[in-house]
């Protein structure tokens, strides 16, 4: 805009200067007397305008030029004033400028995804630039925690608690889900190997290309097959016996699992805490159910409807 103002000012100043010097070029002094060395009767030279003559077509008068310059300067002031005003956006976020004065600007457009329960504290948030492919990929991993969605997690906990209930032990704890253990299991499951050297973990490798609802049923079937290797009162020695022993280990309270696709199979690993298969310890105490429920300091043990030990922390008194 400044370039156009300068260009028009220079362009319009040329005829204005010529009009001011007309008296000098026409051979007439400002007081009306003839200049020395000039012929008053001679015809004006080509390209020279007489002072008293009427402007020909295409020639601007001084008053017209002054009016145009005034209009141009007024337009320039209005444009500069409009550009200096802050632009209000929908978000209203402020960003400091180089002069230190906050100005309003529009931030990068973002898409916020939350899970179906819309609990950002648990699941966090994902900011995605407007790319449909990336959005679909992030949504799949966002809703599935460590390869397992909420229904599969619930099925794992419920079915393992059914196995623990059928044992009829005095001190059998009810298992609860732990996302912290699931994160640890996610590191092990990526190895895509069926060899399990961790006696506090259970694994399963099933022929299933996609992680679906049948994963839990097939895994439980494999784990129950290992019951034939279990011997109460004896330390587990093989992988099969140790896996079932860990499932019915009474002191274990929390579980976390993760699944990973490995070629045409699916591998799943579950970790328990407190860890089971401790040497020279019994997996559980036989007898009346819930007869010897234990709990952490400050919590109260209870017996639920499935005859499994539960515990809770009382609400603080204010």
Swiss-Prot record:
Entry-linked Gene3D superfamilies: CAP
UniProt-annotated glycosylation sites, renumbered to this chain: 21, 31, 130
Tissues where this protein is expressed: Component of the acid-insoluble and acid-soluble organic matrix of calcified layers of the shell (at protein level).
Keyword annotations from UniProtKB, A to Z: Glycoprotein, Secreted, Signal
Bias type Polar residues, positions: 27-44
Record carries keyword Signal: yes
Any GO CC annotation of this UniProt entry: extracellular region
Main localization (coarse): secreted
Localization of this protein: Secreted
Classification via Pfam families: CAP
Highest taxon listed in the record's lineage: Eukaryota
SCP domain span: 158-272
Database matches in SMART domains: SCP
Segments for region (Disordered): 27-55, 83-105
Signal peptide extent: 1-19
The protein's name in its UniProt record: SCP domain-containing protein 2
Record organism: Lottia gigantea
């Amino acid at each position: 805009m400044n370039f156009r103002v300068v260009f028009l000012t220079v362009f319009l100043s040329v005829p204005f200067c010529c009009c001011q010097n007309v008296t000098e070029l026409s051979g007439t002094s400002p007081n009306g007397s003839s200049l020395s060395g000039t012929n008053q009767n001679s015809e004006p030279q080509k390209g020279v305008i007489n002072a008293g003559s009427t402007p020909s077509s295409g020639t601007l008068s001084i008053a017209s030029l002054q009016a145009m310059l005034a209009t141009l300067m007024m337009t320039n002031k209005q444009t500069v004033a409009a550009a200096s005003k802050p632009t209000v956006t929908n978000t209203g976020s402020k960003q400091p400028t180089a002069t230190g004065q906050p100005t309003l600007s529009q931030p990068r457009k973002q898409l916020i995804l939350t899970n179906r329960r819309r609990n950002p504290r648990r699941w966090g948030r994902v900011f995605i630039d407007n790319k449909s492919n990336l959005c679909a990929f992030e949504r799949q991993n966002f809703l599935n925690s460590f390869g397992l969605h909420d229904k599969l997690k619930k099925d794992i906990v419920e079915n393992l608690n059914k196995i623990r209930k059928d044992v009829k032990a005095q001190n059998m704890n009810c298992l609860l889900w732990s996302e912290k253990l699931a994160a640890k299991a996610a590191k092990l499951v990526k190895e895509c190997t069926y060899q399990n050297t961790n006696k506090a973990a259970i694994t399963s490798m099933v022929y299933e290309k996609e992680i679906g609802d049948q994963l839990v049923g097939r895994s439980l079937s494999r784990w129950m097959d290992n019951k034939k290797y279990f011997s109460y009162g004896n330390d587990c020695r093989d992988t099969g016996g140790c896996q079932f022993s860990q499932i019915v280990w009474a002191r274990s309270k929390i579980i976390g699992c993760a699944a990973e696709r490995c070629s045409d199979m699916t591998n799943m690993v579950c970790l328990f805490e407190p860890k089971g298969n401790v040497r020279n310890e019994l997996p559980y105490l036989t007898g009346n159910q819930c007869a010897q429920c234990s709990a952490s300091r400050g919590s109260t043990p209870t017996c639920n409807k499935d005859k499994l030990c539960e515990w809770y922390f009382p609400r603080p008194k204010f």
